[in-house]
Amino acid sequence: IVICQVNSIVEEGQLPRVDIPGDWVDYIVKASEPYPMEPLFTRDPAKIQDAHILMGMMTIRGIYAKHGVRSLNHGIGYNGAAIELLLPTYGEELGMKGKICTNWVLNPHPTLIPAIESGWVEKVCAFGGELGMDRYTAARPDIFFTGPDGSLRSNRAAAQVAGLYGMDLFLGGTLQMDYVGNSSTVTNGRLSGFGGAPNMGNASGGRRHTTRAWCEMAPQNGSMASGRKLVVQMMKSSSKFGPGFVPELEAVKIGRKAGMAAAPVMIYGEDVTHVVTEQGIAYLYQAQTPAERTKLLACVAQGTPLGEQVSPADIRDLRKAGCIAYPEDLEIDRSRANKELLAAKTLEEIAEISGGLYEVPERFRKK
C-alpha cells in the first residue's frame, strides 16, 4: 500500500517531473500545511571535536590508504564529516588524491563540497537531495546524477543497491558496542534511529566483482569467499553516559521489553571489519574467533572494564603484529588533530568554496 502526503495537487501535465508513477499510488493525502524540509545530512564543521579529527586522520591513513578504498558510504555523524573535510588537507599531504575516496554512495553532504571542488571526487550516487544543496548539485552534473532540469531524482532504490553490492566500505558512528562488536544507537534514554546503516553495514553475499579493498577482507580460515565489504564503526571509548563498550547491548533488553522478535542491533559484530576509537584502530577482520575480536577491542578501550582484559604485553604484541594501530604506529602527530586541519571550519566557508551555490539552511545561519 502506497500513501503519499503531498503539499499540493495540480492538473495533469503540470508536474515538472515524475518520481513516482501515479498507478503505483493508492492514497493521496494533501497536507494542511507544507511539509517542513529538514537538513538531515548536514553537520556543522564548527561542532567537530578534536577527537573526531584524530579518529578521522587514523581512518584515512590506517584504513582508506592502507586498503585503497575508492568507493564508500559515510553515515551522517561528525566522524564522517571530519573525514570529508580532512581529504583536501591531510589526505592531500599523504598523496592520496585519485587513489582513495573517488566514488561515493552518499546523500549530498555539504561537508563533501571542499573535496569535490579540489578534485577528489569523481561521482556521487545520491539517495536523494539535501536542503540547501539544490543549486550546487544542479551545477555539477559531472558529479551528481541529475536529470535534464538539473534536479536530483529520488534515487533511493539504485543507491541502496550500489551500497549493498557496489561499494567497498561503509563507515558510521555508533553509541554502544558489546564485547564482540555488535553495535546499536538504541540505548537507555536515547532511541536514536539508525536509518540505512543495517543495509550499508553488512557483507552482501551476492557480490562477485573484485577490488583491492574488497579482496583484502577475504576470510583467513580457508573459506572460498574471495572478499567482503569493509564495515567501519567509530565510537569514543567512554562518554558522559559511561563506557561505550558494554558486556550486553542495552538494545537487547529494550527490544525484549518492547516485544520485538529481533533486538534493534544496528550492525552485527560478524560484519564489522574495523573499529576506530580515539585510542586507535582494531582490525577485527584479522580475528579468527569472537574471543580474538574481544581482545582487539580491549586494546582500543583502555580505561574501561573491557580494557582490563588485555595486558600491556598483549597490546605490544598486537601492535607489532599489525592487528591494532595507535596514532604513533600510523605516524600521526596527535597535536595536529584540531580544526586548523579542516578544509572548512564553518558552513559559511563551505558556501564560499561552492562559489555561493550552497545555501546554508536557516537553522544553521548565524543570528
Residue ranges and their predicted role:
Residues 1-74, 78-102, 110-367:
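Conserved phosphate- and dinucleotide-binding cores of soluble alpha/beta proteins
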Residues 106:
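Active-site histidine-anchored catalytic micro-motif
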